A protein has these predicted regions:
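A detector for small-residue-rich transmembrane helices and their helix-helix packing motifs
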Residues: 2-199
């Protein structure tokens, strides 16, 4: 036999929808990549083309598409883990972080990526979730959220170098825009949270 507090049970219940939503989005990415491969990469045209007015709506489609399975595989695990950790802040906040990051990442790519390039992939979202989780604790002053920030930095902090120009074919612009979006989301959602003071 075992016992479980109501708070623990409620916490576990809160995670289940996150697994469904975040896991469902990841499954959607895999389905789209299967369709893309079967259609000779026809869906790649839904990526962001820098400074192409007609490509602006693709800011909303590009994060869910990838240039092949190796590209998708590299994004899958961090998207799932960081997405679920962000979900723990609440479904509404997860949605806000996701939408803000999609827009800031996509606009950054559209504005400053090299001309005549197409950008796809969920890495902008990954960087958005990462930045949100890293800075949220400093706005909330919550000891557990600060501890989570430290743990996330320990495991994923090294990928922050991806916001700098580097390897050919890697969209540092999308990474930078995603990280900016994560910071903006943390400031917007938690910047007015009262600090905990001890006297």
């Amino acid at each position: 036999m075992s016992t479980q507090s109501f708070a623990d049970r409620r916490s576990l219940e809160g995670v289940k929808p996150g697994v469904v939503v975040v896991g469902g989005l990841l499954a959607l990415m895999w389905v789209l990549e299967i369709i893309d491969s079967a259609s000779f990469h026809a869906l790649d045209q839904l990526g962001i083309i820098a400074r192409n007015i007609g490509s602006l709506p693709h800011i909303l489609t590009a994060p869910w598409l990838h240039f092949g399975f190796p590209h998708l595989i590299s994004n899958s695990v961090p998207f799932l883990i960081l997405g679920l950790l962000t979900w723990l802040a609440g479904p509404g906040r997860w949605l806000a972080v996701t939408l803000i990051t999609v827009v800031t990442s996509g606009l950054t790519v559209w504005l400053i990526a090299p001309s005549n390039t197409i950008t796809l992939g969920a890495s902008g979202l990954v960087f958005g979730y990462l930045a949100y989780l890293l800075v949220r604790g400093f706005f909330t002053r919550n000891i557990w959220e600060i501890a989570l920030s430290v743990a996330v930095f320990f495991f994923y902090g090294s990928i922050l170098l991806g916001v700098l120009p580097g390897a050919s074919g890697v969209s540092w612009q999308g990474h930078l825009g995603g990280a900016i979006g994560g910071f903006i989301a943390a400031k917007f959602l938690h910047g007015s949270d009262p600090a905990i003071r001890r006297v």
